[in-house]
Curated annotation (Swiss-Prot):
Monoterpene synthase (TPS) involved in the biosynthesis of monoterpene natural products included in conifer oleoresin secretions and volatile emissions; these compounds contribute to biotic and abiotic stress defense against herbivores and pathogens. Catalyzes the conversion of (2E)-geranyl diphosphate (GPP) to (-)-alpha-pinene and, to a lower extent, to (-)-beta-pinene. It is an enzyme of class 4 (lyase). This is (-)-alpha pinene synthase 1, chloroplastic. The Asp-Asp-Xaa-Xaa-Asp/Glu (DDXXD/E) motif is important for the catalytic activity, presumably through binding to Mg(2+). One of its GO terms (biological process) is terpenoid biosynthetic process. Its EC number is 4.2.3.119, 4.2.3.120. Mg(2+) 3 binds at residue 532. Binds 3 Mg(2+) or Mn(2+) ions per subunit. Mg(2+) 2 binds at residues 380, 384. Pathway: Terpene metabolism; oleoresin biosynthesis; Secondary metabolite biosynthesis; terpenoid biosynthesis.
């Protein structure tokens, strides 16, 4: 417990306005310096003189004792970001990548022209699946959308209720191609049933393999495990496949020598699918793919795939540097460094965004996500620890007025918080308006107001020491998790159209939004409840469950929450991938992947409060360090 520090905002703030070149070739940050101005009001500049503080209505900071979180400081200062080199932004690298893209497209097309006498139908299907799987895991699939669809349409034409066999009329099926086909086809929205896996059980109803663990057999079980992770609700056979294959692979790791295969197995077991962020997977798979001779296809130019993957990784690295430089200027210009009561994780949030969306044209999404999450973190620390209940009630009312003059009743430190919320939400709405061709501000404001209301409810519980029922806490906690406000404006800045009927399937009242919010609340609480309780925050999913179920232990509660998380993940999979949906996967993918990004942040611990271990490693591996060509 430490006394409050009164924080004064600088009189001159540099307000960033971004112009994102959707071609991806340029990112031009524009800074407008406005003397004695710290705010905008729907296009009107608001001077500090026009919002002078009314001392009679302000909450006094004198002698207020405040709680503070024990958080480490920002790990990535401006000097470090500026010192990063980005040699792969030169045009010659882009030109080389474009040539390789053409050659890889030729490799895809050549699969349709193979001599039918020189390759069996099964080998042909495996090669097509391998090619699609490889470009996706290497992070270069965005260049081959047409070729991927053609390959998968061909594979799907051979799909039967027993999976994939040696031909359309064959009664002999193959587990490797069936498992890889089930996973890949399902991820692209094809209607494929997991029941095909029942045909690979023995008479006892168990999955079985020979005792001798050959490399081919290990790879088959690895593909079975990867397929089992794309499970939908109620698919018992997928649970059985996951249990069997996970045990088999863990046993194999103890026996096979250290190799690209053992590393691949280790990575898949470590991250699964829901926390294996695409750019992290690409970074890891580049290393594995470069050493992997046993999984190469004779007629495919695997070295070209690898070279292209490395070039694309590093070319994006150059764009990341420019975006980071802009983000740091925004962070400094917003007055954030003076907010010493909260965590500063803008670089970490940008990293998560760039791990799930590394298309060059989606700069607005990446930067918008980082900004929104920074605001969420500031508000989280203010409502949970630093602010008094009276101050928070005033702030909540001020947000609903959406007018800088509302800050007259706020203490000085809250003025800065209010204005970063106000300015940033308005600026992101302007970007969304341009992308969507309609006004989005009022809709997005409503989302932020509901989010603030949920925080206010939690602040009241903290102040009173009340532990609500699990249902009451859980429903409020899904809103206060921040998933909706972290996703809404960033996805609206993309080049994907979101008419009202599509937005309803991604935002409220969609099941996708509800489940994504649920996993953030549930997983976050399992990682944070002990630290929160030490700071006086009694209510959590764990404590509320124990209150509702007298006699249960923390272990019982955690087991229950973890089972809920498993079910939520399956529900999320279904909402994203359900066949014949009126909303394309592409419209839902960013919101879905945001849930994966947050889930990764809580995989080992609260990676947002303690960002100096796994989260720091993620930043270095996917943003700071290029790969060696």
């Amino acid at each position: 417990m430490s006394p409050v520090s009164v924080i004064s905002l600088p009189s001159d703030l540099c307000l960033p306005t971004s112009f994102i070149d959707r071609s991806g070739r340029e990112l031009i940050p524009l800074h407008i310096t406005i003397p004695n101005v710290a705010m905008r009001r729907q296009g009107k500049l608001m001077t500090r003189a026009s919002m002078s503080m009314n001392l009679r209505t302000a909450v006094s900071d004198d002698a207020v004792i405040r709680r503070r979180g024990d958080f480490h400081s920002n790990l990535w200062d401006d000097d470090f970001i500026q010192s990063l080199s980005a040699p792969y932004g030169e045009p010659s690298y882009r030109e080389r990548a474009e040539r390789l893209i053409g050659e890889v497209k030729n490799s895809f097309n050549s699969m349709s022209n193979e001599d039918s006498e020189s390759i069996t139908p099964l080998d042909d299907l495996i090669q097509r699946l391998w090619m699609v799987d490889s470009v996706e895991r290497l992070g270069i699939d965005r260049h081959f959308k047409k070729e991927i669809k053609s390959a998968l349409d061909h594979v799907y034409s051979y799909w039967s209720e027993k999976g994939i066999g040696c031909g359309r009329e064959s009664v002999v099926t193959d587990l490797n191609s069936t498992a890889l086909g089930l996973r890949t086809l399902r991820l692209h929205g094809y209607d494929v049933s997991a029941e095909v896996l029942n045909h690979f059980k023995n008479q006892s109803g168990q999955f079985a393999c020979t005792l001798k663990q050959t490399e081919d057999q290990i790879r088959t079980v690895l593909n079975l495990y990867r397929a089992s992770l794309i499970a939908f609700p109620g698919e018992k056979v997928m649970d059985e496949a996951e249990t069997f294959s996970a045990k088999y692979l863990k046993d194999a790791l103890q026996k096979v020598p250290v190799s690209s295969l053992s590393r691949e197995i280790g990575d898949v077991l470590e991250y699964g699918w829901h926390t294996y962020l695409p750019r992290l997977e690409a970074r890891n798979y580049i290393d594995v793919f470069g050493q992997d001779t046993g999984n190469s296809q004779s007629y495919m130019k695997t070295e070209k795939l690898l070279e292209l993957a490395k070039l694309e990784f590093n070319i994006f690295h150059a764009l990341q540097k420019r975006e980071l430089e802009y983000l740091v200027r925004w962070w400094k210009g917003s007055g954030s460094p003076q907010m010493t009561f909260c965590r500063h994780r803008h670089v970490e949030y940008y990293t998560l965004a760039s791990c799930i969306a590394f298309e060059p044209q989606h700069s607005g999404f990446r930067l918008g996500f980082a900004k929104a999450c920074h605001i969420i973190t500031v508000l989280d620390d203010m409502y949970d620890t630093f602010g008094t209940l009276d101050e928070l009630e005033l702030f909540t009312s001020a947000i609903k007025r959406w007018d800088p003059s509302a800050t007259e009743c706020l203490p000085e430190y809250m003025k800065g918080v209010y204005m970063i919320v106000y300015n940033t939400v308005n600026e992101m709405s302007q970007e969304a308006d341009k992308a969507q061709g309609r006004d989005t501000l009022n809709y997005c404001r409503q989302a932020w107001e509901e989010y603030i209301d949920a925080y206010m409810q939690e602040a009241k519980w903290i102040a009173s020491g009340e532990v609500p029922t699990f249902e009451e806490y859980y429903e409020n906690g899904k809103v206060s998790s921040g998933h909706r406000v972290s996703a809404l404006q960033p996805i609206l800045t993309t080049d994907i159209p979101f008419p009202e009927h599509v937005l309803k399937e991604v935002d409220i009242p969609s099941k996708l939004n509800d489940l994504a919010s649920a996993i953030l609340r549930l997983r976050g609480d399992t990682r944070c409840y002990q630290a929160d309780r030490a700071r006086g925050e009694e209510a959590s999913c764990i404590s509320c469950y124990m209150k509702d179920n007298p006699g249960t232990t923390e272990e019982d509660a955690l087991n229950h929450i973890n089972a809920m998380i498993s079910d939520v993940i399956k529900g999320l999979n279904w909402e994203l991938l359900k066949p014949n949906s009126s909303v394309p996967i592409s419209a839902k993918k960013h919101a879905f992947d945001i849930s994966r990004a947050f889930h990764y942040g809580y995989k080992y611990r609260d990676g947002y409060s303690v960002a100096s271990i796994e989260t720091k490693s993620l930043v270095k591996r996917t943003v700071i360090d290029p790969v060696t060509l």
